[in-house]
């Protein structure tokens, strides 16, 4: 197992760790219905993706 030869300073450690973080999910507005949705994923409101309907929209249990 590799071991560091020199002690890493606090500034260098924090600089290195600052790039290792989670990114926020990229959301876009659906051009069909205007609801926010994840990029490259079918819209959960209307079920369309790139102008085509791929699946039925997810409906809540109390809506009929």
UniProtKB/Swiss-Prot annotation:
Cellular component, GO, one term: large ribosomal subunit
Keyword Methyltransferase: no
Region (Disordered) residue spans: 1-20
Alphabetically ordered keywords of this record: Ribonucleoprotein, Ribosomal protein
GO terms of biological process kind: translation
NCBIfam families assigned to the protein according to its UniProt record, in alphabetical order: rpmF_bact (TIGR01031)
Protein name: Large ribosomal subunit protein bL32
The encoding gene: rpmF
